[in-house]
Design a protein with these regions (language model features):
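Gly/Pro/Ser/Thr-rich low-complexity, intrinsically disordered segments predominantly at protein N-termini
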Residues: 1-196
Length: 196
């Protein structure tokens, strides 16, 4: 038996999207150029990597940068076609004051995506949109099928590198935006990749 096809709105602005009550399912969406894009639920490895990052970064921030905080799946409104885009990374760090009731993360400095086979195109499509936010210093892409991370960091002139810095299984992720050196192996603790 198949379920009824859910009819989605044709085009939405960010204001429409933030007021939209949803489609009546538990599906999650982000807004891409005015069109709703469904977000697949994370698999176990994706979720574990996301949790490990949130714990490691959250503890570091609490101890070393008490004015900063990490959020899981924060909404960000890129500068590129700002009225038509509301992207949702896996994790984000901001050092702006807490703004209760605000659905957009204020002034993120670090945005993180966990790359899965099913979301690779969407993830890399989001990168230039994240980079359009003036507050963003670093964008971290962490793979969920192998122990690998790719880090993009804005330079002192405000420019982004053409290619990311690649961190392999034995490497350390240097997150200058929050002053954290995180061994990549810690990101994969308790995952099947840590045992490979």
């Amino acid at each position: 038996m198949t379920g009824a096809q859910v009819k989605l709105p044709p085009l939405m602005t960010v204001a429409d999207f933030l007021e939209w009550p949803g489609d009546g399912t538990k599906a999650r969406y982000e807004l891409v150029d005015g069109v709703l894009r469904a977000m697949a639920p994370p698999n176990d490895t994706h979720g574990l990597i996301q949790s490990n990052l949130a714990i490691a970064i959250g503890l570091h921030l609490r101890e070393n940068r008490p004015g900063c905080r990490i959020n899981i799946t924060p909404g960000v409104q890129p500068r590129l076609r700002a009225d038509w885009n509301f992207r949702i990374p896996d994790l984000g760090v901001t050092c702006a004051p807490n703004a209760p009731g605000i659905l957009t993360m204020p002034d993120p400095v670090l945005l993180i995506e966990v790359l899965s086979p099913g979301n690779a195109n969407d993830t890399w499509d989001n990168v230039p949109h994240y980079a359009s936010l003036p507050s963003v210093v670093e964008i971290l892409i962490v793979h969920s099928t192998r122990m690998k991370a790719e880090l993009l960091r804005r330079n002192a002139n405000g420019e982004w590198p053409e290619n990311p810095e690649v961190v392999d299984a034995a490497g350390v992720i240097h997150l200058a935006s929050i002053g954290l050196d995180l061994p990549l192996a810690e990101v994969y603790v308790q995952s099947h990749l840590a045992r490979v």
